[in-house]
Amino acid sequence: MCSGPKSNLCSSRTLTEIESRQKEEETMLLLEFAACDDLDSFKREVEEKGLDLDESGLWYCRRVGSKKMGLEERTPLMVAAMYGSIKVLTFIVSTGKSDVNRACGEERVTPLHCAVAGCSVNMIEVINVLLDASALVNSVDANGNQPLDVFVRVSRFVASPRRKAVELLLRGGGVGGLIDEAVEEEIKIVSKYPADASLPDINEGVYGSDEFRMYSFKVKPCSRAYSHDWTECAFVHPGENARRRDPRKYPYTCVPCPEFRKGSCPKGDSCEYAHGVFESWLHPAQYKTRLCKDETGCARKVCFFAHKREEMRPVNASTGSAVAQSPFSSLEMMPGLSPLAYSSGVSTPPVSPMANGVPSSPRNGGSWQNRVNTLTPPALQLNGGSRLKSTLSARDIDMEMEMELRLRGFGNNVEETFGSYVSSPSRNSQMGQNMNQHYPSSPVRQPPSQHGFESSAAAAVAVMKARSTAFAKRSLSFKPATQAAPQSNLSDWGSPNGKLEWGMKGEELNKMRRSVSFGIHGNNNNNAARDYRDEPDVSWVNSLVKDSTVVSERSFGMNERVRIMSWAEQMYREKEQTVV
């Protein structure tokens, strides 16, 4: 007797487990047919076996609003809405045996949540069918998200016309005509790649910024090693037609290349024109300089135009291209520091002591006018030379100006002091001719030395040397008339070795001192030469080549003038003693 009841109990439990497993298998079969949109098989299972259309089962899928995969509780209506099975969905709704607002599973999602989370091709039609069946657009899941909130997270996988239509549908507005228009105008692109959630949105974040679009979009190579949709990737791939050259590396313009339109350009990457639509419209000179005709309703995946007037980039009125934003743009507000000043092609020629072949003598009347015309410092040339050389040249102008003024004043004082000693007009003219021979005819402009001085200083030394030599020869005019004049030797007027010298050595300076002493009584003078090492120093000539910025050491001050006057007075005394 005990065995009987126990046997009946075991058999009932076994029957219940078998029936439940069979029921789960039948439900799983319905879910499979709903996902594949196999209406005939789905109807056969429902009509012949009498399966419940509102029965839920476990379905392996992605959780709504998450990237995690797992077994979730779903009804055939939810699966049909998720995969866009419009035939099965319409059949289920037409029977009226399934609740369109039923929430099941741990997520407590509805068929409308599943429809927007699936992002299927027929998503708009599925949502429209559910809304016609009185589906609630404000229903919330376990996380408090409405269908519209779920769609915002996955909208980057939807094209713009469909996205706008879905948003209007989920907001509950009267959008019947707008939905039909959006569906008709939608450009359906058949892609062999499924939607990849790992790809970043090319219109969001840094990928949608103007800086990335102009200089990095379809320029940098993609680092993904697997096959994916190139149209959804912001980087360039081997063999892609949307490839662009880096505008910072290749100086091309936004003007389309006529040779590239014909098929291929022989210049390749070195061409100065844009190759393709992307290079032309994404060029920094043209990107977002015009307003898009569709504005915020633009359906382009990558748009080259601004959707708002605030997004438009400024355009240069003279060139018609966009104004480049660079760190040097702030210099335009500062006078004298504008980048245009550095790019000037007009430069001042180097200042030379010989302007147009005329020696820069203090007696030259046009010297001052030539100097006034070159007072303006030359423009800095970044292309031809360095800034340091240009700066030194500009500084040397002021130094040469002051040097010439000093030379003019000194020359007048010497002539006033010794002008009365010249008694022979013929010898004066001969002396003037010989002095002109010592002027450099065509001095070569030397580059600045390590001290920053140029050949103009050397020319000044040569001029002073010639004057000193000519002044020494004036002693011949003081020879007594009873004695025969010595034969003039023109070679003695030059350097001792017969070569043109630009500097003054110690031996030549000592000879000049002996000639200036007026102790010459002829070529047969046997008097012992005096040692003139104690004579006043004439090294003031070297100061002409020094910088004139420091008054105490580098300028012709009162001390130099007093020394010159004392030297002239001593020569006058020696002359009187010689005559007597």
Curated annotation (Swiss-Prot):
InterPro entries given in the database record: Ankyrin_rpt, Ankyrin_rpt-contain_sf, Unkempt-like, Znf_CCCH
Tissues/organs with expression: Expressed in roots and anthers.
Compartments reported by the entry: Nucleus
Region of interest: Disordered: 421-451
A biological process from GO: regulation of DNA-templated transcription
Coiled coil regions in record: none
One of the record's GO cellular component terms: nucleus
Keywords: ANK repeat, DNA-binding, Metal-binding, Nucleus, Repeat, Stress response, Zinc, Zinc-finger
ANK repeats: 72-102, 107-139
Matches recorded under SUPFAM superfamilies: Ankyrin repeat
Any Pfam family: zf-CCCH_AtC3H23
GO molecular function term, any single one: zinc ion binding
Primary localisation category: nucleus
Induction: By salt stress.
Zinc finger (C3H1-type) stretch: 251-278, 286-310
UniProt xrefs under PANTHER family: UNKEMPT FAMILY MEMBER, ZINC FINGER CCCH DOMAIN-CONTAINING PROTEIN 47
Function: Involved in salt stress response. May positively modulate plant tolerance to salt stress.
UniProt name for this protein: Zinc finger CCCH domain-containing protein 47
